[in-house]
From Swiss-Prot:
Pfam families: Periviscerokin. GO terms for cellular component: extracellular region. It comes from the Eukaryota. This is Periviscerokinin-1. Keywords: Amidation, Neuropeptide, Secreted. The keyword Transferase does not apply. Coiled coil: none annotated. GO terms for biological process: neuropeptide signaling pathway. Mediates visceral muscle contractile activity (myotropic activity). It is found in: Secreted. Belongs to the periviscerokinin family. The modification Threonine amide is found at residue 11.
Amino acid sequence: GSSGLISFPRT
């Protein structure tokens, strides 16, 4: 759940 350029899923 990153709030950067790309949103990655939280693991």
